[in-house]
């Protein structure tokens, strides 16, 4: 059944929502969660502070919505790449390319770090935080690992899970360090390191 086109009001709301998320990413990365002000986010988006509250309940709600949106974008990108693969070997290659390409985005690791610090300090948001973490890990579910590596016994699955868990922090650490060592850790250098890390973790699997 064809999707009904959005009317002008819905399109405007959608545009505002997108602009607020984009502005929020800039402010949260630059100022951190604690330092970020909704008024600054509204100004960066070219909207009023009231518009922020029309779309999000609070700064926390906006922050988590941003993280969920960006996480979903990355998961969708990976899934789309894997759908084009005809074999497990091709899927591993596609995942490797996806992982190395993470070096292009210098804001996502900082945002991820902010999110993890937020999670440590806000136990009252436990349920939503847990769901966000599960979504962040959803690219490492059983279907994904079986697509790449075939049937796994318990020991093999445990090894894969540890390797997958290590990938994200390694990217975050390298990109964070690149702000202090830009000549040593250029994007090209980081891509090279990430490729080596991936091969070390998965080639022998």
Task: List each model region and its residues.
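Basic, helix-initiating cap at the start of DNA-binding domains
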Residues: 1-31, 35-44, 61
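Hydrophobic/aromatic residues within well-ordered alpha-helical segments
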Residues: 16, 59, 66, 70-74, ...
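Amphipathic alpha-helical segments enriched in hydrophobic/aromatic and basic residues
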Residues: 28, 37-38, 49, 59, ...
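Short hydrophobic/aromatic patch on the recognition helix
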Residues: 45-56
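Short helix-capping/turn signature of helix-turn-helix
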Residues: 56, 101-102, 115-121
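Hydrophobic alpha-helical connector segments
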Residues: 65, 78-108, 157-167, 191
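Amphipathic alpha-helical packing segments from all-alpha helical-bundle domains
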Residues: 80, 103-110, 123-150, 192
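Hydrophobic/aromatic-rich alpha-helical bundle segments in the mid-to-C-terminal region
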Residues: 126-130, 148-205
């Amino acid at each position: 059944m064809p999707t009904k086109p959005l009317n002008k009001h819905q399109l405007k709301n959608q545009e505002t929502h997108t602009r607020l998320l984009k502005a929020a990413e800039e402010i949260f990365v630059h100022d951190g969660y604690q330092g970020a002000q909704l008024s600054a986010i509204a100004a960066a988006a070219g909207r009023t502070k009231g518009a922020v509250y029309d779309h999000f309940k609070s700064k926390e709600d906006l922050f988590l919505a941003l993280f969920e949106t960006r996480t979903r974008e990355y998961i969708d990108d990976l899934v789309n790449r894997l759908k084009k693969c005809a074999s497990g070997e091709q899927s591993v290659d596609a995942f490797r390319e996806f992982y190395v390409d993470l070096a292009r985005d210098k804001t996502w690791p900082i945002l991820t770090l902010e999110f993890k610090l937020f999670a440590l300090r806000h136990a009252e948001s436990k349920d939503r935080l847990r769901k966000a973490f599960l979504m962040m890990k959803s690219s490492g579910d059983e279907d994904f690992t079986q697509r790449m590596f075939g049937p796994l016994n318990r020991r093999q699955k445990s090894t894969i899970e540890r390797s997958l868990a290590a990938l994200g922090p390694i990217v975050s650490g390298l990109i964070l360090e690149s702000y202090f060592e830009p000549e040593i850790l250029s994007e090209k250098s980081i891509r090279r390191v990430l490729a080596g890390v991936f091969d070390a973790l998965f080639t022998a699997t």
